Amino acid sequence: MLDIQQIKEIIPHRYPFLLVDKVLEVEEGKRAIGIKNVTANEEFFNGHFPDYPVMPGVLIVEALAQVGAVAMLKKEENRGRLAFFAGIDNCRFKRQVRPGDQLRLEVEMTRVRGAIGKGKAIATVDGEIACETEITFALGDKKE
């Protein structure tokens, strides 16, 4: 298991854009399972929607991508690199995510070739699918 400090050592995201609270399981370069506790205090709920708060679907996908990035960047040879979001395919949203929900974020890499990886990603709440998609990552280095 990785706590928030360990996650911050692997991926560069920070508040308000760090969307993973802990990682329950990680197989370096292969798969990871993370958790996002969705609270009423999330910044995005100020505008989406004030009278009926719903987590934006794009942020659910971003949370999945961050869990995938942890899996990719946990590998020794990828440490210190960045995992860029390079693509999304077959994305479907099946359930609203609201304050008080706990998102379980599962990403399994299905293909990795060099600096490019593709994975199957599923976000669930209480065992119910909220989002499922395929995401593509491109590993890169920081350019000064």
From Swiss-Prot:
Superkingdom of this entry's organism?
Answer: Bacteria
SUPFAM superfamilies, from UniProt? Answer: Thioesterase/thiol ester dehydrase-isomerase
Kindly state which reaction or reactions the protein catalyses: a (3R)-hydroxyacyl-[ACP] = a (2E)-enoyl-[ACP] + H2O
Q: Which Gene3D superfamilies match?
A: Hotdog Thioesterase
Location in the cell reads: Cytoplasm
Q: Does the keyword Nucleotide-binding apply?
A: no
**GO biological processes:** fatty acid biosynthetic process; lipid A biosynthetic process
Its GO CC terms? Answer: cytoplasm; membrane
> Which UniProt key words apply to this protein?
Cytoplasm, Lipid A biosynthesis, Lipid biosynthesis, Lipid metabolism, Lyase
MF term (GO), any: (3R)-hydroxyacyl-[acyl-carrier-protein] dehydratase activity
Q: Kindly report, in one word, the top-level EC class recorded for this enzyme.
A: lyase
- EC number(s) stated in the UniProt entry for this protein: 4.2.1.59
Q: Which CDD domains match?
A: FabZ (cd01288)
Query: Which spans are transmembrane here?
Result: none
Q: List the disulfide bonds.
A: none
**What role does this protein play?**
Involved in unsaturated fatty acids biosynthesis. Catalyzes the dehydration of short chain beta-hydroxyacyl-ACPs and long chain saturated and unsaturated beta-hydroxyacyl-ACPs.
Q: Which family does it belong to?
A: Belongs to the thioester dehydratase family. FabZ subfamily.
UniProt-recorded name of the protein = 3-hydroxyacyl-[acyl-carrier-protein] dehydratase FabZ
Originating organism: Bacillus anthracis
Query: What gene is this protein a product of?
Result: fabZ
